[in-house]
């Protein structure tokens, strides 16, 4: 659609970059390319009980120090586990080595390259709660705790890397895919947050603040997430992130469910009419 709207020749497109919802999870059949279940989006809280069980097993410190994340339904790991536990076809495909996992970037790469490449980048991997941000590998100990097979996981690459070439069968032209970043990290790069201490805040469905911490991984004492901002030439640049799940989604709720407003723009006038909201 973007190519058609731009009215540009496909042959003049030098390369493609992908940015995506980070934690949203898909498992699919390697042979057919069809998902075994609907994508479970980042806001979905259905895996709360799985997370509580992990906490009861006193695994919070393990996950925190290895992945930089807290045990929470937000991240991909327990979504993967839920599908494996509740969708019968996934077990059969896993047994036959036909099951694949990916966040949205991985699924897009798989489809755009016509099933040739099963890749992700470090920023997306760092949001799965299965990736060790110290060793830069899928973590065997964590996978064992979750009973998730490494065989379904994609290869993790630099954020700027060779992710394959689009298939002519898919979009009519062979175009290199040379960059992949999770959406919030892509926003940080877009705002030129390349220096240690530089910060961006994005307001959309949720609100997300990211601060570049350079080559140093910092574990926050204030419930911030430790994540990978980007990886270039096999070197991580780390970040701290504050995530608020409901921002613009709250405005949507006021408009569509409560019917308090007719359009989102009205919220600005209402906010400005209040002298003090303490």
How would you label these PLM feature ranges?
Residues 1-37, 49, 61, 65, ...:
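N-terminal glycine/serine-rich phosphate-binding loop of ATP-dependent small-molecule kinases
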Residues 23, 77-78, 125-126, 160:
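Short, conserved phosphate-binding/catalytic loop or strand-edge motifs used
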Residues 36-37, 70, 123-130:
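Glycine-rich phosphate-binding loop of ATP-grasp-fold ATP-dependent ligases
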Residues 44:
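Carbohydrate-associated surface elements
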Residues 48, 55-69, 73-118, 129-140, ...:
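Active-site core segments that coordinate phosphate-bearing ligands/cofactors
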Residues 145-152:
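A structural motif corresponding to the C-terminal end of an alpha-helix
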Residues 155-162:
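Gly/charged, well-structured mid-domain segments that form the phosphate/adenylate-handling core
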């Amino acid at each position: 659609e973007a190519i058609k709207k731009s009215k540009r020749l496909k042959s003049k497109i030098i390369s493609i970059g992908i940015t995506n919802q980070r934690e949203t999870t898909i498992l699919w059949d390697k042979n057919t390319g069809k998902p075994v279940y609907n994508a479970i989006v980042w806001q979905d809280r259905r895996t709360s009980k799985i997370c509580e069980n992990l906490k009861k097993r006193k695994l919070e410190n393990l996950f925190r120090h290895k992945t930089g994340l807290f045990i929470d339904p937000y991240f991909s790991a327990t979504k993967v586990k839920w599908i494996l536990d509740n969708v019968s076809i996934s077990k059969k495909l896993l047994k036959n080595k036909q099951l694949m996992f990916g966040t949205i970037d991985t699924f897009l790469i798989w489809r755009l390259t016509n099933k040739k490449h099963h890749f992700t980048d470090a920023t997306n991997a760092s949001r799965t709660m299965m990736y060790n941000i110290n060793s830069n590998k899928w973590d065997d100990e964590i996978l064992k705790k979750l009973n998730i097979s490494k065989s379904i996981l994609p290869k993790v690459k630099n954020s700027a890397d060779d992710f394959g070439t689009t298939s002519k069968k898919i979009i009519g032209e062979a175009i290199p895919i040379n960059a992949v970043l999770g959406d919030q990290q892509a926003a940080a790069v877009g705002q030129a947050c390349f220096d240690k201490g530089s910060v961006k805040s994005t307001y959309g469905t949720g609100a997300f603040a990211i601060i570049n911490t350079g080559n140093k991984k910092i574990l926050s004492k204030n419930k911030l997430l430790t994540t990978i901002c980007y990886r270039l030439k096999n070197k991580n640049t780390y970040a701290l992130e504050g995530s608020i799940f409901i921002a613009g989604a709250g405005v949507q709720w006021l408009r569509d469910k409560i019917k308090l407003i007719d359009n989102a723009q009205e919220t600005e006038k209402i906010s400005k009419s209040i002298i003090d909201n303490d």
